[in-house]
C-alpha cells in the first residue's frame, strides 16, 4: 500500500510538473507572439519612415534645385539690371550731348534766320534742305532745294542771299560755329556736314521782310 501511495504521489508530481511546463510554454508562446507582433509593427514603421525619408530627400533635392535656379535667375537679373543701368547712364550722357548739340544748332538757326530771313521746310528734312530765303537787296523770295549733305548748295545759297549784305559777319559767325564741332552722320563725309548741319532745323514761322 505504501508503494501505491508513492506511485500516486510521483504521478501527481509529474502531472503538476507537466501542467507547470505547459503553462510556461503558453506564457512563452504569448510572449513570443507579442514580440513578433511588435517586431512586425516596428518593421512596418521602419519601412514607412524609410519611404517618407526617401520622399523628403526627393523633395529636398527638388527644393535645392529650385533654390539654385532662383539664385541663377537672381544673378542674371542683377547682371541685366546693372547692364541696363549702364546703358541708361550712357544714354543719359548721349542725350546730354545731343541736347548741347541741339542747343548749338538752334542758336545757329536763329543766326541764320536773322541773317538771311530763311524758312526751312521741316517735312523735307533730314534727306533734303528745302525752303525759301529772302534777298536783303530787293526782298526777292529765293527758293532752294538741295541734298542735306550738299555743301556746294549751301555755299551757293550763301552767295546769292548775301550780296552786299549788312549781316556778312553773322554769316561768318554761322559758318565758324558750323565748322567747329558739328557731328558727322553715318556714311557721309565730314566735309559735307559742317555747313549743312547748321540749317537742318525747322523754323516754325515764315520769314519777315526787312
Curated annotation (Swiss-Prot):
One of its GO terms (cellular component) is Ndc80 complex. Keywords: Cell cycle, Cell division, Centromere, Chromosome, Coiled coil, Kinetochore, Meiosis, Mitosis, Nucleus. The keyword Coiled coil applies. It comes from the Eukaryota. Its main location: nucleus. It is found in: Nucleus; Chromosome, Centromere, Kinetochore. GO terms for biological process: cell division; meiotic metaphase chromosome alignment; meiotic spindle organization; mitotic metaphase chromosome alignment. The keyword Cell division applies. Residues 42-106 form a coiled coil. Component of the Ndc80 complex, which is composed of Ndc80, Nuf2 and Spc25. Belongs to the SPC25 family. Acts as a component of the essential kinetochore-associated Ndc80 complex, which is required for chromosome segregation and spindle checkpoint activity during meiosis and mitosis. Required for kinetochore integrity and the organization of stable microtubule binding sites in the outer plate of the kinetochore. Participates in SAC signaling that responds specifically to disruptions in spindle microtubule dynamics. The NDC80 complex synergistically enhances the affinity of the SKA1 complex for microtubules and may allow the NDC80 complex to track depolymerizing microtubules. This is Kinetochore protein Spc25. The lineage of its organism: Eukaryota, Metazoa, Ecdysozoa, Arthropoda, Hexapoda.
Amino acid at each position: 500500500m505504501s508503494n501505491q501511495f508513492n506511485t500516486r504521489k510521483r504521478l501527481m508530481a509529474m502531472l503538476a510538473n507537466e501542467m507547470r511546463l505547459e503553462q510556461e510554454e503558453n506564457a512563452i508562446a504569448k510572449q513570443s507572439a507579442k514580440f513578433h507582433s511588435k517586431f512586425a509593427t516596428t518593421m512596418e514603421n521602419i519601412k514607412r519612415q524609410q519611404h517618407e525619408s526617401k520622399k523628403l530627400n526627393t523633395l529636398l533635392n527638388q527644393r535645392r534645385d529650385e533654390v539654385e535656379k532662383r539664385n541663377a535667375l537672381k544673378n542674371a537679373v542683377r547682371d541685366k539690371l546693372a547692364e541696363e543701368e549702364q546703358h541708361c547712364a550712357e544714354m543719359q550722357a548721349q542725350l546730354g550731348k545731343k541736347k548741347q548739340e541741339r542747343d548749338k544748332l538752334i542758336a545757329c538757326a536763329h543766326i541764320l534766320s536773322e541773317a538771311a530771313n530763311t524758312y526751312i521746310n521741316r517735312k523735307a528734312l533730314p534727306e533734303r534742305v528745302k525752303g525759301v530765303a529772302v534777298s536783303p537787296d530787293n526782298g526777292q523770295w529765293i527758293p532752294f532745294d538741295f541734298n542735306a549733305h550738299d555743301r556746294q548748295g549751301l555755299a551757293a545759297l550763301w552767295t546769292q542771299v548775301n550780296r552786299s549784305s549788312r549781316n556778312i559777319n553773322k554769316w561768318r559767325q554761322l559758318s565758324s560755329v558750323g565748322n567747329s564741332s558739328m557731328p558727322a552722320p553715318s556714311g557721309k563725309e565730314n566735309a559735307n556736314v559742317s555747313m549743312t548741319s547748321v540749317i537742318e532745323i525747322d523754323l516754325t514761322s515764315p520769314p519777315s521782310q526787312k
